[in-house]
Amino acid sequence: MTKFFFKRLQTAPLDQEVSSLDASDYYYRIAFFLGWTPPKGALLRWIYSLWTLTTMWLGIVYLPLGLSLTYVKHFDRFTPTEFLTSLQVDINCIGNVIKSCVTYSQMWRFRRMNELISSLDKRCVTTTQRRIFHKMVARVNLIVILFLSTYLGFCFLTLFTSVFAGKAPWQLYNPLVDWRKGHWQLWIASILEYCVVSIGTMQELMSDTYAIVFISLFRCHLAILRDRIANLRQDPKLSEMEHYEQMVACIQDHRTIIQCSQIIRPILSITIFAQFMLVGIDLGLAAISILFFPNTIWTIMANVSFIVAICTESFPCCMLCEHLIEDSVHVSNALFHSNWITADRSYKSAVLYFLHRAQQPIQFTAGSIFPISVQSNIAVAKFAFTIITIVNQMNLGEKFFSDRSNGDINP
């Protein structure tokens, strides 16, 4: 059982068969748990659709609605730290609604990319190429598990820090269980909230990790393609026609990678744009909660884990997009420095065509406005400092406590 769950986290032996689909193994397992990948059987599909409706209703409808209703009905009962902790999640939930709906509705794109890019697996023939491929499969699955641990770690820390403080973690509106009536009610309401928020968090995980999974696949196959290009016309036993066929195969594989990048481009543009809009606001609220209001070591840990989770939502994807541009440049450089000088005319014509195509790097943009890069991620994160400066200059924290002490805000 342990081997079944964790075998993809270790690099497979070079003599073992590995496919591109294996790189998204854990991603699709989480998708199956959330109800996003229905089975093929008709009866099972109907039963499974009920679970899909349940998770979608809890994560996309009830979670943001429950937080908003709590502000309307029980706003006077929030402490500043509780309010900011809940508000962070509420704002993130609004972004999660957009990202999750887009990702769920575009799951067909992932299946299409898997079908296309799987045709490149048979190109991994040398030991070096298989080593690159096997390491990538293990690394991508490990990243998905690390994301899952980080996201659920935030939920876990928030749950226990709040319960030990005698409060419900997010104080979702719950007409069935009032956590203020007793110890057992507190635990029941808190566990229910934890389940709802965990589902919403995993839905956001699906929106945040698909780019890492597939861009890593693109990078891996570009690295293998670069190795194949460097070895073109190095075998004296092959004829010029066979060398030409190898060049044509490289051109076709590069075209397949470009086609996959075009498939993922629309969904990546929307989800990363939505994430960029949320990063600065969420980081600003978390920093305000830590800097301007009383906290225990546990609430600080919960806020820090939230900051880590927010940063991991966009930073790895931005970094991979930059590396993908560099990989495209490396492919064109490898082609230019390959052994084509003494080739025949048809081979040189293919080289010129391929060189023209390879010099156009694979780039992605967020909302068709700004490039997806580390620099863009840092730029939107700087908005957090703007929020902190506004709160500091207007002394909002001191005014809040002053109003409470004067009785203007009744708890």
From Swiss-Prot:
Cytoplasmic side residue ranges read 1-46, 108-139, 207-271, 318-369
Question: A Pfam family name for this chain?
Answer: 7tm_6
Q: How does it sit in the membrane?
A: Multi-pass membrane protein
Tissues in which the protein is found: Expressed in olfactory sensory neurons in the maxillary palp.
Q: Where is it localised? A: Cell membrane
Q: What is its main location?
A: membrane
Kindly indicate whether the keyword RNA-binding belongs to this entry. Answer: no
Q: Which InterPro entries match?
A: 7tm6_olfct_rcpt
* Single Gene Ontology MF annotation: odorant binding
Which family is this protein grouped under? Answer: Belongs to the insect chemoreceptor superfamily. Heteromeric odorant receptor channel (TC 1.A.69) family. Or2a subfamily.
Q: What else is known?
A: The atypical heteromeric and topological design of the odorant receptors appears to be an insect-specific solution for odor recognition, making the OR/Orco complex an attractive target for the development of highly selective insect repellents to disrupt olfactory-mediated host-seeking behaviors of insect disease vectors. Odor-evoked OR currents are independent of known G-protein-coupled second messenger pathways.
Q: How does it assemble?
A: Interacts with Orco. Complexes exist early in the endomembrane system in olfactory sensory neurons (OSNs), coupling these complexes to the conserved ciliary trafficking pathway.
Can you say what this protein is called?
A: Putative odorant receptor 59c
Lineage here is:
Eukaryota, Metazoa, Ecdysozoa, Arthropoda, Hexapoda
